[in-house]
């Protein structure tokens, strides 16, 4: 069963559906792997071994008698501990919520279950989308590539356990980089979807609706192809989150050949390391070899995005009316830029994973991710390189709104050309 550890979720689903392996075997293998690696990582804070084994047996019986329930039938998954899970604690890393047990699932958890997936654990996160991987409830999570480093914030445990092979697929949340930074630091793939594509209902601290387009829920995995599967499971209105728009996903993804790509390695605020710069250039070259028309061009509105971010976070005084005016103008500028390009390629952060419990020395740590939280554009992070310290380096691929699938397709091309996810040192 070691073969399934590190395998794509799509491959696992096909193997279960065709009865080459059983869901019980797969779930047991991942639970055993979590038992092996989690003491060093502290990524999974609630394991659901008993219920997961029971559900896996039921999944195998159903597969034998009636076939698969959905595209993820029998596949294990994990979720960040901000999502409601019926009968299981949901603490969000907040002390006063240590004994909180919801009686219903978050929309995205329910949709994963309906697709046949089996929950095997909930993962650590800092409170209120905090700035490092430390939780006052569960302690800190370590990076599987170097346990002296952080996996990032705030989908910390999710990125760490996926990178370490303990889960093939998971759910995180992102308000300014909380999916994308951990994906970069841990060398996995992740999607921050178009604002309004996936409901945030049942996610602690995610208000949803048009008043909070920055906060999104998205899938995390090791392979870009698994993001595509999860996107189709998760997208669409739930009748509760008023910000979700009933826009159908396209049936076909356009080919990369001929797509226009703008790339930049330096946003002018947070200077990247040479390794980050080299990785972005390599990713741009990979897209060029896939037939994209690649141009080095930095968007002119990155500085304005930083100022707006400071207003949102209270670092800079700005009235609500003035904020709304500048935000509208900013989004118009992004739309104008994206009318010239199909994709934008950039760093995720200026450096690799910071040391454990290190506080970010500057808000510029988010300067590469926050612009696209404010604009609502979909972003995919994929590993495209390795630092001199042997740490993962990801790149950020931004697409036009509602074209999440195009960003995923580009990530797949980079993954194939540059290697993508690699086994973490903690499990070698």
Predicted ranges, named:
Residues 104-234, 373, 378-394:
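Short glycine/serine-rich loop segments
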Residues 30, 52, 227, 261, ...:
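Residue-level signal for inorganic ion chemistry
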Residues 19, 30, 74, 114, ...:
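Glycine-rich, small-residue loops and helix-cap segments
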Residues 62, 68-91, 118-121, 287:
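Conserved small-residue hinge/capping positions at short loops/turns
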Residues 23-28, 57-60, 274-298, 320-341, ...:
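Acyltransferase
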Residues 192-278, 418-428:
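A short helix-breaking turn/cap at a secondary-structure junction
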Residues 86-99, 164:
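DPxDG-like acidic metal-binding loop motif
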Residues 1-54, 289-291, 423-428:
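An N-terminal boundary/leader segment
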């Amino acid at each position: 069963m070691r073969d399934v550890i590190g395998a794509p979720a799509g491959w696992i689903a096909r193997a279960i559906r065709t009865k080459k392996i059983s869901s019980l075997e797969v779930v047991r293998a991942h639970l055993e792997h979590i038992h092996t690696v989690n003491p060093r990582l502290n990524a999974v804070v609630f394991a659901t071994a008993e219920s997961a084994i029971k559900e896996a047996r039921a999944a195998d019986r159903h597969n034998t008698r009636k076939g698969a329930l959905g595209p993820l039938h029998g596949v294990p998954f994990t979720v960040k501990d901000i999502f409601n899970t019926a009968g299981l604690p949901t603490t969000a890393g907040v002390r006063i919520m240590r004994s909180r047990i919801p009686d219903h699932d978050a929309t995205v958890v329910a949709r994963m279950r309906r697709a046949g997936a089996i929950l095997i654990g909930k993962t650590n996160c800092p409170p209120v989308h905090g700035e490092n991987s430390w939780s006052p409830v569960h302690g800190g999570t370590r990076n599987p590539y170097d346990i002296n480093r952080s996996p990032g914030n705030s989908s910390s445990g999710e990125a760490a356990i996926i990178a370490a092979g303990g889960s093939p697929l998971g759910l995180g949340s992102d308000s300014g980089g909380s999916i994308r930074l951990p994906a970069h630091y841990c060398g996995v793939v992740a999607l921050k979807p178009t604002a309004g594509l996936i409901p945030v209902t049942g996610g602690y601290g995610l208000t949803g609706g048009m008043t909070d387009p920055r906060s999104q829920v998205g899938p995390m995995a090791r392979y870009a192809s698994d993001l595509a599967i999860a996107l189709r499971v998760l997208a669409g209105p739930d009748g509760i989150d008023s910000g979700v728009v009933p826009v159908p996903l396209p049936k076909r993804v356009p080919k990369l050949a001929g797509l226009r790509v703008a790339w930049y390695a330096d946003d002018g605020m947070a200077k990247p390391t040479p390794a980050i710069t080299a990785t972005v250039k390599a990713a741009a070259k990979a897209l060029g070899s896939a037939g994209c028309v690649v141009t080095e061009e930095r968007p002119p509105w990155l500085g304005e995005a930083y100022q707006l971010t400071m207003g949102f976070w209270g670092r800079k005084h700005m009235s609500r009316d003035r904020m709304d005016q500048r935000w509208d103008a900013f989004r118009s500028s992004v739309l104008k830029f994206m009318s010239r390009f199909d994709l934008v390629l950039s760093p995720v952060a200026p450096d690799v994973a910071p040391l454990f419990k290190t506080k970010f020395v500057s808000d510029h740590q988010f300067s590469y991710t926050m612009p696209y939280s404010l604009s609502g554009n979909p972003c995919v992070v994929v590993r495209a390189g390795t630092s001199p310290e042997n740490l993962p380096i990801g790149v950020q691929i931004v697409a036009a709104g509602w074209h999440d699938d195009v960003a995923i397709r580009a990530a797949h091309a980079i993954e194939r050309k540059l290697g993508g996810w690699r086994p973490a040192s903690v499990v070698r």
